[in-house]
A protein has these predicted regions:
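Internal insertion modules embedded within essential enzymes
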Residues: 9, 26-31, 48, 108, ...
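Short, mixed-charge amphipathic alpha-helical segments
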Residues: 37-52, 107-119
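Alpha-helical phosphate/pyrophosphate-handling elements in metalloenzyme active cores
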Residues: 51, 61-95, 101-110
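Short, contiguous pre-domain boundary segments
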Residues: 13-42
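Active-site flanking loop/helix segments enriched in acidic
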Residues: 53-81, 130-148, 419
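N-terminal acidic, proline/glycine-rich, low-complexity intrinsically disordered segments
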Residues: 1-15
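Short hydrophobic/aromatic beta-strand micro-patches
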Residues: 292-294
């Protein structure tokens, strides 16, 4: 590590430098209202959190983000996200300090002395590697991801801080150059959104996915967003009526019933329209109603009542209560026909299931779940241990990261044309699929393909981030048959 001597002591709040930017104008970094909320919660050590903020603000003084904002606004924003998740003192302190070792003269030993080994582990886990002799940006990225996963294996809060860090960076990605927007969006879809899903942190997962799609395929994003906006306007009265009807049936016989509604996320629609080839009108869960009740028995009773009220669609019922998802998600899902034959999804769960569904692993800290919460954490992290055990045989970081991406992979990949346009395909798609995704005429005249500049067989399975060039004949009908079983689209 480079020499980081002569480090000044952590400044007290009263010793903070004047609130100035490069133009010497006062600025609000958002800490004051955030700290006021912290002080209302007795479980937080406000003195330690304020001390961490004071160090971060002093250390980042004179540093600015691409937006022109003082850098301190970023760690404060990350800490706010973690506070909203209900994370603990160490996690919030780690968030405030997460870039201090990477970008300032302070080292990890100093963090250990001032804030303890637990915070130091979290900060070190999200700190990128220093100057090491690596030849490519891909190697640097791979080494950083490996370092993060190793730390995550010791303390899952490392990745929770990193998810919040990535979320705020994606929220402000409009200030990045286009190449970085694309690179970080791909990484977000390949690594960070799937991790959020595995950990059950739904809100972060969905926002990361939507932001990544916005930068990877802005045309598709805007088209879906426009359609969803119309659906939201059309469905406002419809959903209000549905909720009123269900409430009238359930509230007289059940206590603590909550009924809410939502319109599906952009990425959720994107996967069905652009990956699975469905028409917008064929998506049955654009509208959804959520019913939260006190007990598991109430869940099944509520299911029977809504099936009496509305016609259930065959094959659309899923019992994730008796068979939870791998990320411990539990709910009953059913799709029914409402007034006017409009389909909508109903999700039914208990309050405990709802906390787990919304906050995932973070619910352990937010709701102090005790031993049961610890068991839930162990179950959720089993995949990390297995993944790292499998990766121990990898000869280098890039091999390990390929294994990680493969383990996390969803059912979609993103492949580029030589001009930089992006095509979204199902996982396992071949270059034939890519050709037909461009246009049927291209697929019909296809004679071969290059991936990353090298000739590949037409059965080659594409991977996210690759550049595919389709080679064609001037004569139509010379390409591979679209009836080939290889075709995924």
């Amino acid at each position: 590590m480079e020499n980081k001597k002569s480090i000044p002591p952590v400044p007290a709040a009263a010793e903070l430098p004047p609130e100035q930017t490069a133009d010497h104008k006062p600025y609000d970094d958002g800490f004051a209202p955030f700290f006021a909320e912290i002080q209302k919660k007795p479980q937080y050590d406000s003195a330690r959190i304020e001390k961490a903020y004071s160090l971060a603000r002093s250390a980042h003084e004179g540093q600015f983000r691409r937006s022109g904002e003082p850098y301190i606004m970023h760690p404060v924003a990350v800490a706010k996200i973690l506070f909203q998740l209900g994370m603990d003192n160490e996690c919030i302190i780690g968030a405030l300090l997460h870039d201090v070792v990477e970008d300032t003269p302070y080292d990890i030993d100093y963090i250990t002395r001032e804030f303890g080994p637990e915070v130091a582990l979290l900060v070190d886990g999200v700190t990128k590697l220093g100057q090491i002799p690596l030849s490519t940006r891909e190697e640097v990225q791979a080494e950083n991801i490996r370092k993060m996963f190793m730390a995550m294996n010791r303390d899952v809060r490392v990745i929770i801080i990193k998810l919040a860090d990535r979320l705020h960076n994606m929220r402000t990605a409009k200030f990045w150059p286009p190449y970085k927007q694309r690179e970080k969006s791909l990484e977000t879809l390949e690594i960070y959104a799937p991790i959020a899903h595995r950990l059950g942190i739904r809100a972060i997962k969905e926002e990361l996915e939507d932001l990544a799609i916005f930068y990877l395929d802005p045309i598709a994003y805007k088209e879906i967003e426009q359609n969803l906006r119309l659906k939201q306007v059309e469905g406002e009265r419809f959903l209000a009526d549905i909720k009123t009807q269900i409430r009238a049936k359930l509230e007289p016989i059940m206590k603590n019933v909550q009924i809410t509604s939502r319109v599906k996320s952009v990425h959720g629609i994107f996967r069905k329209v652009y990956i699975k080839g469905k028409d917008f009108e064929q998506i049955f869960d654009i509208y959804a109603v959520r019913i939260i009740v006190d007990s598991m028995i109430d869940c099944y009773n509520a299911l029977g009542i809504v099936h009496d009220m509305f016609t259930p669609l065959p094959g659309r019922f899923k019992d994730y209560i008796s068979t939870p998802k791998p990320n411990m998600y539990q709910s009953l899902h059913t799709t029914v026909l409402g007034p006017g034959g409009i389909p909508f999804e109903i999700q039914i769960r208990t309050w405990d299931m709802h906390r787990t569904a919304e906050y995932g692993i973070a619910a352990h800290w937010k709701y102090k779940l005790g031993k049961g919460g610890k068991d839930s954490i162990d179950n959720r992290l089993e995949w990390i241990h297995k993944m790292l055990e499998t990766g121990e045989a990898s000869t280098n970081a890039e091999d390990l990261v390929r294994n990680i991406k493969g383990d996390l992979s969803s059912d979609e990949i993103f492949v580029f044309t030589p001009n930089g346009d992006i095509k979204t395909l199902p996982s396992g798609a071949t270059v034939i699929d890519f050709a037909y995704a461009i246009h049927s005429a291209v697929g019909n005249r296809m004679t071969g393909a290059k991936v990353n500049g090298k000739i590949v067989p037409i059965t080659y399975k594409l991977k996210t981030g690759e550049i595919c060039e389709v080679l064609t004949s001037n004569q139509p009908g010379k390409g591979p048959s679209r009836d080939l079983s290889l075709i995924h689209i």
